[in-house]
């Protein structure tokens, strides 16, 4: 896989995370409370400062009342 494509995916995921939180009408602090993490964790995840693993992604989706498969499909189709 080309580095440019790899880098693009890492930029798309944080955007999707932020979009899902906003769509759910949650602040960073409210989502953090649902996930039992700090708001700094949410901020760093949404800015790409830290990577999110697949289990964290699934938990994030569920906390935002979004189907993880639907969200992952959206991410996979993003360009």
Regions found by a protein language model. Give the residues of each.
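A short, Lys/Arg-rich alpha-helix, primarily the initiator
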Residues: 1-23
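Recognition helix of helix-turn-helix/homeodomain-like DNA-binding domains
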Residues: 36-52
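Short amphipathic recognition helices of helix-turn-helix/homeodomain-type DNA-binding modules
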Residues: 70-79
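Conserved hydrophobic/aromatic packing and binding residues within compact polymer-binding modules
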Residues: 17, 31-32, 42-45, 71
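Short basic helix-loop element that most often maps to the first helix and adjoining turn
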Residues: 15-34, 59
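Helix-turn-helix/winged-helix DNA-binding modules
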Residues: 12, 23, 49-52, 63
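DNA major-groove recognition helix of helix-turn-helix/homeodomain DNA-binding modules
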Residues: 55-71
């Amino acid at each position: 896989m080309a580095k440019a494509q790899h880098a693009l995916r890492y930029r798309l995921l944080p955007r999707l995370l932020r979009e899902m939180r906003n769509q759910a009408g949650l602040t960073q602090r409210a989502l953090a409370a649902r996930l039992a993490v700090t708001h700094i964790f949410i901020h760093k995840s949404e800015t790409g400062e830290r990577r999110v693993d697949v289990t964290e992604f699934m938990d994030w989706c569920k906390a935002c009342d979004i189907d993880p498969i639907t969200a992952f499909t959206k991410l996979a189709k993003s360009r």
